Amino acid sequence: HLGRKWGCKTVAEIADLWPESIVAYGIAGPHNPAVLALRRLEKWIYKKADALIFTMEGAYDYIVEQGWEKEIPRAKVHYINNGVDLEQFDYNKEHFRVEDPDLNDPNVFKVIYTGSIRRVNNLGLLLDASKCVKDPRVKLLVWGDGDERAALEQRVREEHIGNVTFKGRVEKKYVPSIVSRADLNFAHNSFTYLFNYGISFNKLFDYFAAGQPILCDFPCRYNPVVTYGAGTEVRDPQPQEVAAVIDHLSEFSD
């Protein structure tokens, strides 16, 4: 309507698939009246826009699976992923440095996770994998917070998982200092079929900017970590498999 009123083109940017995300995470079923109403709105937006920009590379696969390809042509669908301001990243890396004994220890193989610590993030798998790691130099260092943190810290204490440390939350400006000193940055989340359309986590681009290897432990049809040779993907995210990859990569730091 605004496009017609002002005589201009309309471009819609889609960073998340709604309402599909509601269904994928089990918040509501596909036939829920609210989901059906949002689906109609979603299709209307896609049809009326002159161009669509998705942050997921495989978003047109989703459109095809919905049966909308005749009304929404491929030519008007574009992919622009999230990103990071490299100048700001480098500035923050130099001016907001985190002083941490593990980060500063050259004898520690630092596997770093930054981000939310909620049930959907499934950090319990990382604890299970850490228990299977054989290299004594490996430490999983977790920066972030969330409602699952206390329970996971309790697991670490009760199960004597000595190679995992929760560091707490830091301001975003300190993240470049942390991830740039990793030996391995960990891109981790609970798998959902939405990943088949691509991934564009903000923290993933912090990892790219850091220039350190990335371990991605969930299968993904469009994975920029693999596409651009920025790290390794674990197709079967079981604790033993993840631990084996970490042990293998730690050998290269000798």
Task: Identify the meaning behind each predicted range.
Residues 64, 83-100, 122:
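Acidic anion/phosphate-binding donor-loop and adjacent secondary structure
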Residues 71-72, 91-110, 250:
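Nucleotide-sugar donor-binding and catalytic loop/hinge architecture
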Residues 2-8, 32-52:
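Membrane-proximal helix-turn-helix segments that form the acceptor-binding/catalytic region
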Residues 135-141, 150-184:
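Nucleotide-activated donor-binding/catalytic signature segment of Leloir-type glycosyltransferases, i.e.
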Residues 102-130, 141:
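Conserved donor-binding/catalytic core segment of Leloir-type glycosyltransferases
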Residues 121, 171-178, 185-208, 215-226:
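Nucleotide-sugar-dependent
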Residues 58, 80-83:
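Carbohydrate-associated surface elements
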